[in-house]
């Protein structure tokens, strides 16, 4: 993950008031964000949130209906072909010809983009070294492991030296060890100067790799920032409690000064607190004890990107089909 705070160049991706609808359904609703050159930018959201639609507009698979957007300095409406020439794409699903060799895949892609012979062969050698597939260059892709296929797809996406590489769920379906190695390859690509636009359902992946993150839900960008900034919006610590009377406990605790927010869950509730949780906890326990409310479960932790994602999208609530009242976010007195 590169640090780009001192980067004074214009953003390499600019999205302003972008909207896209399918009939009467507005999939993307007036979103705006920027990505700086050299960043790893993660674009996160639940299924059906508008994430894929927004990305498909940026890579010119869908037309720009309303708003403004540019990629690598090229306007999506005026110069869609220039945009396509400036980007690389690695889709979620494997799209390799099973009977072609590793070398043939890259060779064909280079020819498709009219790369000169010498440049094409040199680039193939560079990329095979980058993704550590030099010894597999003459093997057919059907013999490769899942991780090797993903690395080959990344190499193919980099063949034309794109300014921006779009990675859609690059580690989905990979075992944990292979996922960690893939993170190293992604960082290596980024260190070569390629801006990366990443989508992932793995929050630890976004946390580890990203310089900046935006979360989209119901077609709108609900929050943007660094992973540290996003986690900090939830408070310093999170205290999860299960009690003999959760509703009464929430009513008693919601106005305590140290509590920023309370999230009610199916079996208990989480307290986002502004202070060190170990110092806040004794006061919380006193309140419950004085009200004769029995504490059955307690857990103290730092906010994670999973917590951020659930907080801002309510994904857990929608997935479980819970009643809306159980997913209310109650503002504490310390907000």
Per-region residue spans from a language model:
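Catalytic Walker B motif of ABC-type/P-loop ATPase nucleotide-binding domains
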Residues: 165-168
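Conserved ABC ATPase "signature" region
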Residues: 107, 111, 118-136
